[in-house]
Amino acid sequence: MKVGVLKDIKVGEYRVIATPAEVSMLVGDGNEVYVQKGAGEGSGFPDEAYVKEGAKLVDTKEEIYATCDFVAKVKEFEPCEYKLLRENQIVFTCIHPAAHPEEVQALLDSKCIAFTAEDSHRYGSPNCEAAGKAGALFGLESLLSINGGMQEYRAAMFFVPT
């Protein structure tokens, strides 16, 4: 199967759907993996790391969509991507269907096979555990005196002027 790893284009999104180690496993299983140039940079994975694991680098998202049977990315599709989806192409990404009806309609119109990343793990799994721990750490960080400390916290929580 031809698997495509897209560079996310949503503003503020720096994650990548597959690490070089995961690409290595896909290639080892006999898949051809295409990675869009720069897909892993925001997560600390240079293009060379993907090539070392057997991926083929491509310049554009259009090449990924046109070439690959399976396309994956982290965040929901942007409107500029809707026209690139193909019938029977398998896509895996966050979709959040209730919040993005126009995206759902584009997926239906394209006749692709879509899987939602946000619903692909069991709630309470390590993924959620990690998110919970990170949330607690960010909360603690906000209470540090260099970030305003407890006074800022009280003001935010109880609307008490400082």
Regions found by a protein language model. Name each.
Residues 2, 79-162:
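Glycine/serine-rich phosphate-binding loop and adjoining beta1-alpha1 elements at the start
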Residues 2-106:
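An N-terminal-biased, well-structured beta-alpha scaffold segment characteristic
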